[in-house]
Amino acid sequence: MFRTLDDANVQSKRVLVRIDLNVPMANGEVTDLTRIERIVPTIAELSRKGAKVILLAHFGRPKGVASDENSLKHVVKPLSKVLDHSVHFAEDCIGDKAKAAVDALKDGDVLLLENTRFHKGEEKNDPEFVQALAANGDLYVNDAFSAAHRAHASTEGLAHVLPAFAGRAMQAELEALEKGLGNPARPVVAIVGGAKVSTKLDLLSNLIEKVDALVIGGGMANTFLAAKGLDVGKSLCEHELASTAREIMAKAETTKCAIILPVDAVVGWHFAADTPHQTYGVDSVPGDAMILDAGELSTDLIASAIDDAATLVWNGPLGAFELRPFDTATVKVARHVAKRTKEGKLVSVGGGGDTVAALNHAGVVDDFTYISTAGGAFLEWMEGKPLPSVDVLKK
């Protein structure tokens, strides 16, 4: 297990809290507050318990160079609004400016330090930079699971030099992931969709050793269909990965993991919304058409696999969900998962950028057991890779 805020005495302590503020911006305004909302419980609890709360975060990819566009000062207003608490700001995360701002804090105050990536030492996990950050703290709390796969100074380095704890968002994520794949109720079904097999090879290899059934959808399903000798017409397909797809299917047989591929497909002749479309069996896709979604027989097949499951892990859409009506399979299956979850019959964990967008589109994002907003870290966890900044929090 890992250390949480329950294990920490924070009264009058300077607590460095690593958070995720990599929020979408347009014209200097934050356009989506989801990530800010996720960190409220940790900051509010620390402030309530009388800690001096010092927030560390990165924004964008400034590569060690300070700039106005990547400054965290733009986030101060929305952050204090969501927190319902005033937030002080320091124009640097180390050195005199940071020290002066920290020294001025009273118990319960909240201070945001400037972008950690304005210093090259952040991404290099440079020991001198770690010490410069640590100089302003007595304890360290990591609440940024989305950066857990990066061993940077503020995500991993600090945990070696200060007493380290998981924040509430980090804790919720780790507990949900443990239920999803770490120690899940069986049978477990995974849905993996999206465009390309090439970006999900490690994921597929890991999942077939851990799950009882694997649903493959989206563009990547075409590569598997082609590998089985079927003609996928002009569909998005990585023909050069046919032998890899066959290896994955063979490995799944030995690990007793059922692979579920589409049996029918909705095809169109143009990659556009509302283009004329028709449903065909996957063995009779016209040579001049492209597969844009899974058909009704396929979604029924997936729904029945979900009915047999106790746990479901989802990464990636089942079709070109951003183009109607090719969002049908994704929406239908997502709503079925939501229904089973609400009935208490399924633990459902979803994550990854496109997945969150697709589940939002289906209107079910609040009905899953847990939705990870982490992207890369969620994928690496699904791939079974170690997460450096989580490992250092273990008791």
From Swiss-Prot:
Q: Which Gene3D superfamilies does the UniProt entry name for this protein?
A: Phosphoglycerate kinase, N-terminal domain
One Gene Ontology MF term: ATP binding
Question: Of which family is this protein a member?
Answer: Belongs to the phosphoglycerate kinase family.
Q: Which GO terms describe its cellular component?
A: cytosol
Residues that coordinate or bind substrate = 20-22, 35, 58-61, 117, 150
**What keywords were assigned to this record?**
ATP-binding, Cytoplasm, Glycolysis, Kinase, Nucleotide-binding, Transferase
Give the EC number(s) under which this enzyme is classified. Answer: 2.7.2.3
InterPro entries the UniProt entry points to: Phosphoglycerate_kinase (IPR001576), Phosphoglycerate_kinase_CS (IPR015911), Phosphoglycerate_kinase_N (IPR015824), Phosphoglycerate_kinase_sf (IPR036043)
> Which Pfam families does this UniProt record tie to the protein?
PGK
Q: Which residues of the sequence carry a binding annotation for ATP? A: 200, 322, 352-355
Whichever gene encodes this chain, its name is pgk
Pathway entry: Carbohydrate degradation; glycolysis; pyruvate from D-glyceraldehyde 3-phosphate: step 2/5
The protein's predominant localisation is: cytoplasm
What's the source species for this entry?
Brucella suis biovar 1 (strain 1330)
Give the reactions, separated by semicolons, that this protein catalyses: (2R)-3-phosphoglycerate + ATP = (2R)-3-phospho-glyceroyl phosphate + ADP
Record's protein name: Phosphoglycerate kinase
Indicate the quaternary assembly. Answer: Monomer.
* Entry superkingdom: Bacteria
Intracellular or extracellular location(s): Cytoplasm
- A GO biological process this protein is involved in? gluconeogenesis
HAMAP family tied to this protein: Phosphoglyc_kinase
